[in-house]
């Protein structure tokens, strides 16, 4: 099981609405990456602060710019392998297109910049996050 950083770790704003996922409806999850102009150095406490700042920026864009209820993704994973609670695994994503798809698929944000490949730490955490999804949503294939 992954040790998820709470929303307070990135000083998230409160969501304006949250719909829970129905366990029997979830079929799988999708990995997304942000449209960043350059990679974020996630190393150490300063790196953690940079990732937290980026998450707040994406949340502001989604809520203020797009009119959504919260940041679109359920979880984020940075290059240091930290897993960040965004909406949370049990809350419906807003990142996969329309409402039907968001009811059936989770959404995980990989904090990657242009040309950046996932680190071994990110990959290990991503695999563990997938395992957590599979424990909660048993229709997700192995």
Where are these regions (language model features)?
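Active-site-adjacent loop/helix surface patches within enzyme catalytic domains
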Residues: 1-141
């Amino acid at each position: 099981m992954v040790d998820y950083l709470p929303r307070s770790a990135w000083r998230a704003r409160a969501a304006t609405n949250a719909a829970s996922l129905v366990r029997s409806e979830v079929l799988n999850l999708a990995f997304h990456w942000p449209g960043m102009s350059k990679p974020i150095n996630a190393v150490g406490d300063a790196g953690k602060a940079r990732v937290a700042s980026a998450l707040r920026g994406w949340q502001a864009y989604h809520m203020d710019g797009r009119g959504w209820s919260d940041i679109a993704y359920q979880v984020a994973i940075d290059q240091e392998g930290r897993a960040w609670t965004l909406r949370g695994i049990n809350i419906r994503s807003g990142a996969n297109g329309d409402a039907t798809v968001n009811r059936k698929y989770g959404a995980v944000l990989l904090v990657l910049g242009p040309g950046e490949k996932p680190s071994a730490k990110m990959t290990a955490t991503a695999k563990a996050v997938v395992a957590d999804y599979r424990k909660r949503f048993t229709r997700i294939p192995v």
